[in-house]
Amino acid sequence: MAKLTKRMRVIREKVDGTKLYEINDAVALLKELATAKFVESVDVAVNLGIDPRKSDQNVRGATVLPHGTGRDVRVAVFTQGANAEAAKAAGAELVGMDDLAEQIKAGEMNFDVVIASPDAMRVVGMLGQILGPRGLMPNPKTGTVTPNVAEAVKNAKAGQVRYRNDKNGIIHTTIGKVDFTPVQLKENLEALISALKKAKPAVAKGVYVKKVSISTTMGAGVAVDQATLDTAN
């Protein structure tokens, strides 16, 4: 058996894997166990009661967290004309059409989010094999294909998170940094859960939000008691 690191031993001693933690207790535990030499992200895994094999039960979308994610987000926008000027004014780092596509083909990928106006999709469509595997392909469901690119840029900068269930029906995303206050992390988590509930597929049956766990980048998952969250039903 592999030898446990000191950190893993402490986590095993502190975290009860069979327990649902009140949200404030869960956050306090994460902060106590966050001993990495960098400011760790706080990640969430939400198990949904869906059948991910069926396309009409897949959950995908985006929501702006009230306190952001703590990350500086670099945005690339495919658009032209007045929309290009609006995107720059909103804070986009990269704006263009064919010229931007050529940069990406050359391997210049210094951005975290890609946004496109509908008329630019003819250009973006040719980048599917590059952007797709990286989760960067613009999509109307996540608000990244839109006529109002300026608003999309502002949302991305304000701490918008995009979510999509994996093959096991689990949503993985980030809700902030470990140096956020407990209130900020709680309200960000509540905003995400509320958005997921609004995105519930009409055909999904039974319990929809089955389990909510939070963790830091280097830590173990802590299961949250949903009754201690203030979310829309």
From Swiss-Prot:
GO molecular function: rRNA binding; structural constituent of ribosome; tRNA binding
Top-level taxon in the UniProt lineage: Bacteria
Organism encoding this protein: Shewanella sp. (strain W3-18-1)
Family: Belongs to the universal ribosomal protein uL1 family.
Protein name in UniProt: Large ribosomal subunit protein uL1
Keyword Cell inner membrane assigned: no
InterPro entries for this protein: Ribosom_uL1_bac-type (IPR005878), Ribosomal_uL1 (IPR002143), Ribosomal_uL1-like (IPR023674), Ribosomal_uL1/biogenesis (IPR028364), Ribosomal_uL1_3-a/b-sand (IPR016095), Ribosomal_uL1_CS (IPR023673)
Matches recorded under PROSITE patterns: RIBOSOMAL_L1
Upper classification of the organism: Bacteria, Pseudomonadati, Pseudomonadota, Gammaproteobacteria, Alteromonadales
Task performed by this protein: Binds directly to 23S rRNA. The L1 stalk is quite mobile in the ribosome, and is involved in E site tRNA release.
Keywords of this entry: Repressor, Ribonucleoprotein, Ribosomal protein, RNA-binding, rRNA-binding, Translation regulation, tRNA-binding
CDD domains, A to Z: Ribosomal_L1
One cellular-component annotation, GO: cytosolic large ribosomal subunit
Subunit structure: Part of the 50S ribosomal subunit.
Pfam families xref list: Ribosomal_L1
Biological process terms in GO annotation: regulation of translation; translation
